A protein has these predicted regions:
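Hydrophobic faces of well-ordered beta-strands that scaffold small-molecule active sites
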Residues: 4-6, 70-72, 110-113, 138-140, ...
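Alpha-helical structural signal in soluble globular domains
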Residues: 97-104, 129, 133, 156, ...
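Active-site core of metal-dependent hydrolases
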Residues: 140, 187-199, 213, 219-220, ...
Length: 326
């Protein structure tokens, strides 16, 4: 059975050096175990692993776990730091490396472009350049340096993505307020803050009518949609009592939840089963979060294997083949 991993990450050594030298609030610190980790202030953001940098390691891991294709993306903190010149440079460094990796392994790798979202003209230029060298989608964090993705400032970028009908992987990062809420303790930013970040971003998109504005947008909500599936009843009740004068959606909240896509990274069989019951199996794709410490390749295989055969095939590859036109 073909397997396509749509949620897997990469860095380059040069990207980390740019971050180290020009990262602003972001930087690298030594952990108690002696390894380097990316922090924002005192809040852990990401822990680079050897597999983030080495595509030979990646291909061996894919071979060992029977993954046929990976669609790779830059992860947190992406390129929303350092000013315009630095943001563009970091995006191009990451995107060029992924394009080169795809050239080296054309049957095994595809990639999401990262864009300097804080500078829309530059972001659109990089989007055009990235698509020309092989990008099959766009990676965006759930907030751009604290700014909502529905901010009209980003409209030119969304219009171009929508025009191109590109899949967008919406991935969480440290949410606004993470420092005030002391989410650095016990890695609460990852465990809870990331889920809040995704949930708030997509909920705002739903209630502002964002998906009506961009009807061809193929959005993928990371980590099984965070808490979105669990809140479906609350969304419906909120819509029921909303004043008609303030309502911006053209459909019901559940309709939008069934319009967007999700990966299967839930770490729990019952959570995946519930996600499918809410949004439908045709909206869910295979993901592992490799090579982060919290990757769950075995869980992704086990949880999809437990589903009906047709559902398993759709999630492991069929849906991704349709969404990414592979």
């Amino acid at each position: 059975m073909t397997v396509i991993d749509i949620h897997t990450h990469a860095y380059t050594r040069k990207y980390l050096e740019i971050l180290r030298e020009q990262g602003g609030d972001y930087g690298l610190k030594i952990r108690p175990d002696g390894f380097e980790e990316i922090f924002k202030g005192e809040t852990p953001v990401a822990f680079p692993q050897p597999g983030h940098f080495d595509y030979d390691i990646r291909i061996r891991q894919m071979d060992d776990t029977a993954i046929d294709m990976s669609i790779v993306s830059l992860t947190c903190p992406n390129v929303y730091w350092g000013g315009k010149k630095t943001s563009i440079m970091a995006a191009q460094e990451s995107n060029n490396a992924m394009a080169e990796a795809q050239t080296a392994y054309p049957d095994r790798l595809r990639w999401f472009t990262s864009l300097p979202w804080e500078y829309p003209d530059a972001a659109i230029e990089e989007l055009e350049r990235s698509c020309a060298i092989g990008a099959v989608g766009v990676m965006v964090l759930a907030n751009v340096a604290g700014r909502s993705l529905t901010d009209s400032f980003f409209a030119p970028i969304w219009q171009e993505i929508d025009r191109r009908k590109l899949p967008v992987l919406l991935h969480p990062t440290d949410p606004p307020g993470a420092i005030v809420m002391d989410m650095g303790e016990f890695d609460l930013s990852w465990a809870v803050g990331f889920m809040f970040d995704t949930t708030l971003a997509v909920t705002r998109m739903i209630f502002t009518g964002f998906f009506d504005q961009y009807p061809d947008l193929k959005l993928i909500a990371s980590h099984g949609g965070a808490t979105l599936p669990y809140l479906v009843g609350r969304f419906e009740k909120g819509d029921e009592v909303e004043l008609p004068q303030r309502r911006k959606m053209q459909q019901k909240p559940t309709d939008y939840l069934r319009h967007i896509y999700y990966d299967c990274i839930t770490y729990d069989q019952a959570a995946l089963d519930y996600l499918i019951s809410v949004v439908g199996a045709e909206q869910v794709m295979f993901g592992t979060d490799w090579p982060h410490q919290v990757f769950d390749t075995q869980g992704a295989f086990n949880h999809t294997q437990a589903l009906q055969a047709g559902t398993c095939r759709a999630i492991r590859s069929g849906n991704a083949q349709r969404v990414f036109e592979l």
